[in-house]
Amino acid sequence: MLSNFCDNGLTDKNTIHSYLPVYEMLFAPKRLTATDILEIGIGPIPHQNGGSIRMWHSYFNNADIHACDIIHINDVHRCIVDVPRIHLYTSTDAYTYALTVNTFLMKNIQFDIVLDDGPHTLPSMVAFINLYLPLLKYDGILAIEDVQDITWINDLRAVTPDELKPFIEVYDRRSVKGRYDDIIFVINKYKRSLHLAV
């Protein structure tokens, strides 16, 4: 279970939010086969962050875990610094074309999962889809968490390529813990790959 690897003191994904059951369902089929996972957002609180990065590292034990954040490396919890298979890109704006090209595209890195837990603004979420959807494997999963307003789903759907619109999933968890932003937007290319295989 994903919750077995979650340190609630270092991530809010299982405390004020209720994301772990969704991620367990989405990511379990990829647990042993995933090779590259990306999360934008290590955490804003100095030295009380990195919990989700460590959780992915333990859960996907055959994958390299990539994490981007604008915070300085000195503010990152030591539990994920200089750890094999964890690649940190700090003091970095992840929402730029230059970063995606120079850091990932030119190195032929494609992701099984890309997860946006960044500034939680609509422009950053739109940029995330535009920049990182092309870096997904044919059966990859894109997830944006902490969608601040349910009406933003329409905007995120609008920038999703038409051929992937049938594989959009929205997980509205607001009623679970009373969090206004407990919403995850997903483009599930893994489901598309299963559909094409039939």
PLM region spans:
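A short alpha-helical cap/connector motif
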Residues: 1-115, 119-144, 148-198
